[in-house]
Amino acid sequence: MAKLVIVESPAKAKTIGKYLGKDYEVTASMGHIRDLPKSQLGIDVEHDYAPQYINIKDKSKLIKELKAKAKQADGVLLATDPDREGEAISWHLANILGLDPHEPNRVTFDEITKKGVQKGMANPRAIDEDLFNAQQARRILDRLVGYKLSPFLWRKVRRGLSAGRVQSVAVRLIDDREKEIENFKPEEYWNVDATLGTGHKSFTARLASDSTGKKLLPKNEAEARAIEKGLEGAEYTVGELKKGKRAKQPTPAFITSTLQQEASRRLGFTATRTMRAAQTLYEGVDIAGHGTMGLITYMRTDSLRISDEAVAAAKEYIADAYGEQYICPYKRTWKTKSVTAAQDAHEAIRPSVPGLTPDEVDKSISGDTAKLYRMIWSRFMASQMADCQQDTVSVTVYAGDYRFKASGYTVTFDGFTVLYEEATDEKEKKETSLPPLEQGQLLKLKELKSEQKFTQPPARYTEATLIKALEENGIGRPSTYAPIITTIIDRGYVEREQKKLKPTLLGRAVDGLMLEQFPHIVDVDFSAEMEKNLDKIESGKADWHKTVDDFYQGFAASLEQAEKNMEGKKVKVPDEPSSEVCDLCGRPMVIKVGKYGKFLACSGFPECRGTKRLVKDTGGICPKCGKGRMLERKSAKGRIYYGCERYPDCDFMTWDTPVPTKCEKCGSTLFRKGSKLYCAKEGCGFEMPVPKKD
């Protein structure tokens, strides 16, 4: 009889099955098979917080099939993902199938390649109870908060609202940033720049100080003009000249948080989109000449560690492709933040076969997976390459009683930058190449320019910067970053505005209530401490029952006090104004949030019950009638679609997104479907791939 191997997904089963052969049957559990009940709390608070797990309703047939296969098999191996969530799935599978969790029936794969699968199969172990308990404690904590706090929000804010332990902190961060922006008072200042020439070359230096070294930054035009006047007739000479060398090091291979941040900045991916593509790359894809294989190591990791074998493979490729001088001459190591032994069991995210280049992979995959693989591969390879070497120069220019400064650099050896440089959220200070300069050299003033500036408020969070803030504050885990953002947007607490995260009026109202009545729930330090406690459970250094009880006792007391504080009170969420007018009574319409998202309602409610669907102009023209604008609409169930504004006179509609690019053949609006753009105008038939970003 064959041995039964159970994984989460059919894709993973297919890849692993290819490596194991006919002596094994590999099947999928399709994720979790048991969970807490949806209709009730499912936790016995009075009896040590015992969870009351039930089989997931639509998994009954699958569970029956798994039991039958396990009964016939010559042994069962549980091969779910190597993290808390995967350990929990295996624990529940063992429980349902009657397996002894203390027996070596658990295997894990850091990479799904032939070698990775063989290594995992050669090292079976018992289910890690501590790892499972960490997941179980998190699940129970989140359930207690969600089920106890949500009804309170229903009564005090609006029906249908829900609250989450970690999500509430994320909303707090976003709302706090919005308050900073609102309270920010811009301050005027002026830059005074001198464009200076040396023969045919010139450079720009900025006013820095007076001759005593006192910093100067004019606060208004009068001060700037006074400095300009003081510079009339001044000689500009090279006063101080500092030359040096610096080495710029590459960034380490990705961990989960940095992968999501970089994919957001470089590719424009949401965290969810990134993890979906990464999951596909890990579980396996068909590659010409290689068959089905996992292309990257496990993508939920905090560890920066790279195996010696992978480093050697990378350096071999670098030597062949770029030359020996591009190899890092020493073993690079990066300090990983404090992680548990289980967390550090993984490597950083890297290509499972370093020699398999993106160009070769692109022949077999496309779209998000191809883009993400190229980024992961390039970042990993660059991490094993030599430093970028630069000659630096900084100059202080003397001009009468004033001092100007400029700095620049010249790349003498490109090193890792020939392949990859990290994207950034902030505008970097510009450094340019300076012409050859000598101390005491007389410079020619070509232009003296003063420019008004104002200090800028902090920027709203993007997905990338929010994930960075969550990670830096110790909130959440690699597996939770993407769901956190999805949840707070889906709940209507936060919305995207030009790729920035902005709190809605509802989100601000709920955050204000949480801050007032449950300050510890939305406290960043408190949440970070809870994450540390969960890590202690994972390491076997803390009891999960005590961790849950310590939290719940304080939470229950806060909830009881909040009920007293808010007795007879309700939080009013301000309506969002709009430019629309009610067709029934002519009053202004306001934007409200319903079960399926935002809609327009008459401000005269309840006297007038006029409503409209909220539509958004996409900028495209209807390909059917050629007259109406293409509008973004929502179906009755909240799904976004696109239709002609002339409906019902024109009934054109599509689920595919209109794009700014026009049809090269007929000039009509193009629509995006997957990785292609197409023209929907009858008889045209034009198609093209989605252009790659630079």
Can you describe what each PLM-predicted range is?
Residues 2-3, 150, 183, 224, ...:
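Basic, low-complexity terminal or inter-domain segments flanking catalytic cores
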